[in-house]
From Swiss-Prot:
Cysteine disulfide links: none
Similarity-based family: Belongs to the DNA mismatch repair MutS family.
SMART domains from the UniProt entry: MUTSac (SM00534), MUTSd (SM00533)
Residue positions binding ATP: 601-608
Record-linked Pfam families: MutS_I, MutS_II, MutS_III, MutS_IV, MutS_V
GO biological process, one term: mismatch repair
Alphabetized NCBIfam families for the sequence: mutS1, PRK05399.1
GO cellular component: cytosol
Signal peptide: none
Protein name: DNA mismatch repair protein MutS
Function: This protein is involved in the repair of mismatches in DNA. It is possible that it carries out the mismatch recognition step. This protein has a weak ATPase activity.
Amino acid sequence: MAEKISPGMQQYLDIKQDYPDAFLLFRMGDFYELFYEDAVNAAQILELTLTSRNKNSENPIPMAGVPHHAATEYIDKLVDLGYKVAVAEQMEDPKKAVGIVKRAVTQVITPGTTIDTANSVDNNFLVAIDFKAKRYALSYMDLSTGEFKVTELSEFSAVVGEIASLKAREIVVGFPLDEAQVKVFERQMNLLISEQFEIPENLLIELSGLTALENQAASKLLAYVKETQMRDLSHLQEVEHYEIKDFLQMDFATKSSLELTANKRENKKHGTLYWLLDETKTAMGTRMLRSWIDRPLVSNSAIQKRMEIVQVFLDHFFERSDLIEALKGVYDLERLASRVSFGKAVPVDFLQLANSLSNVPAIKNILEVLDEMPLNELRSQLDEIPELSGLINSAISENASRTITEGGIIKKGYNVQLDKYREALENGTSWIAKLEADEKAKTGISTLRIDYNRKDGYYFHITQSQLNSVPEHFYRKATLKNSERFGSQELTEIEEIMLEAREKSSSLEYDLFMGLRAETEQYIGRLQALAKTIAEIDCLQSLSVVAEKQGYIRPTLTEGSRIVEIKGGRHAVVEAVMGAQEYVPNDIELPEQTDIQLITGPNMSGKSTYMRQFALTVIMAQIGSFVPAETANLPIFDAIFTRIGASDNLISGESTFMVEMSEANHAIQKATSRSLIIFDELGRGTATYDGMALAQAIIEYVHEHIGAKTLFATHYHELTDLDKELDHLDNVHVATLEQNGNVTFLHKITDGPADKSYGIHVAKIAGLPQTLLERADLILQKLENKPLPAKKVADEQEQLSLFDFAENSSEIIEKIKGQNVDNMTAREALNFLWELKDSL
């Protein structure tokens, strides 16, 4: 016979049935309890004590719990690990409940919807995607700031890249995923996948500026958030359309290899461009700076607008210093506005709002003193919101606690009735003191005192030795080992007045605070607009501080130009780490007629640094930053493509060579004549001749069909002869100094090809044994004196091009065109290559 389930456990099971994919925290008194499998798993993850309910029954129910006051800490840990948490609250006072206490889930917290994050700086983006007619829509929002955007994309690879750039932890899908897509999201990107296929009619977004698919994706994202948060989301901004092409396009591999916002070793900020440029003083400014680095501009007018303000701040040191001090007093307005909207704002949040608003007049005044045209628009957007600051300053006490139940929140003079209750409490305290003094005098008991606790209320404390002097109008309340507690009619009357005043005072203060919170909601839009303006000012002052500190110059950007001319250029991050004295600057020149720069030279000589230096300089210029150079004339690039380093994707089964070819293919397919391509040692992941042949073919293809500015570093010295065949290719190399058998890398880029590779010298620097190095040198001499193998191209032969196709080339081309390479697995791609090889 099955054991009977208690009403409480039945209530738990009924609620759990609606949230099978979440840990259910079930409020019971002062604890949140977990049961069954949730309890077992949570006990292990959170290191909780696993106990059981109905221990003496045949099948005790596993149980674990956390104190309600510490629940946020445990919830955050579960969410950080990628789990969902459903919180079921008591919906009525247990003392007043008839039968079982009513409970209901009030919020589902997920990796993409948490707003109480310990890291108050980084965004926490929740992404939704939808699909129709071979097109994808991607919408994202940050619940903690209210940001809400959407775009449409043509390829799944672009969707993946955008999600990776956003550093999302959860994705809401509006259509059934196939197995390959699930694998990408779950295994490779470690995303929590949630589903939202339906859109409630009242949540359907139909904005004219969005496509039908964009409206659909944004609606499904909004529906998911409403379903999980179960509250008003007044802080959410109207969904905004954006286009990838409106920014300098870089895929995630490029951003990663250039270490723009996260270093490759630890996936942290230190040693990145973000780390270097971040002299921001506000949380909003820090987030905005990261987004600027992630999405550089392609509009020259927008770039120049930023640079002009950076120049103004650079030219006015003292005003900038005052501005920085004012910015330091501004708290995270975006997150504070969100906490108000979510009903989670506590008294200290309002004090931070008031303090932030009190600094706005100072910021505005500094911009007025500067009186520069570029600052006019920003100055006009600085809304002091005097109504809100006045409301908070009149209502909230400067010494208010973090909680809304401890009292002392509302200022004296804000509410007449509250002041009366407080006066009664103060009078009661003086009445107690007077009564204590009177009874001491009447009874002659010098040690008599009036104390208070929750159980006995107010009482007279009398020690054992003085009990003979207790007056008749005292009555016993409690007996202790060495003393007794007594009451009196007068003390009871005073206590009743004080308790009533305390209860009514606490209740009224709570109501007044909740009213203030509700009234503040009407200012959320203005707070968010103010936050955006302050963030922009903060970013621009940050760029000016870095420019001054590092000795950067304002670059010249020319729309439509194809000339690159950088004098004394440096790698911004390497210089910051090493120090300017140690860094060797280099010129970078790609005149109108030069598209490709073929770079040769030994390992460790600085080829990769030189190429990264160029890419970072372009990115810095196009976010509106000054750049590390003596002079810099640049075109405006539409995209940057890189293949740098051996970033094997072993998790997905892709080798170095497959990754090389995939990234090269991405550049070849997407680059335009306005793009920048950087290839570092392309082809080294396969056999020498295969690699060399592919490298040459790719160079030829870029030269003949794309015309993008390209830096191509290689160890294949045979490729340097291409300058005789390709009009728009120049050779450069990293200079070395060879003296008495020792080689010094000068880290200086010089015209012409390198004449040696110095591989043995690099091995010597790495510390290989001397006998091994001597043997390698002997083998090298033999190889250099050995006749060239027949396989090698003879001097008199024409240099081969991989784009001279076989007779059946049209058939092969049609086969290639029929493949969707973005959705092919590594195995499928290799099988297809073998099939093509067999058909040649």
